[in-house]
From Swiss-Prot:
HAMAP family noted in UniProt: Ribosomal_bL36 (MF_00251)
UniProt GO MF annotations: structural constituent of ribosome
GO CC annotations, alphabetized: ribonucleoprotein complex; ribosome
Gene: rpmJ1
UniProt protein name: Large ribosomal subunit protein bL36A
Domain of life of the source: Bacteria
Source organism (scientific name): Prochlorococcus marinus (strain MIT 9515)
Keywords for this protein: Ribonucleoprotein, Ribosomal protein
Length: 38
């Protein structure tokens, strides 16, 4: 998982989700696109 100060969608299938006050990017087709903000 990449930890970044600002997260952006890399791929069309990326989904931005807010969990426990943190923003995450999840992608079931390409798990290497996972990101977390902060």
């Amino acid at each position: 998982m990449k930890v970044r100060s600002s997260i952006k969608k890399i791929d069309q299938d990326d989904q931005i989700v807010k969990r426990r006050g943190r923003l995450y990017v999840i992608n079931k087709k390409k798990p290497r696109n996972k990101q977390r903000q902060g």
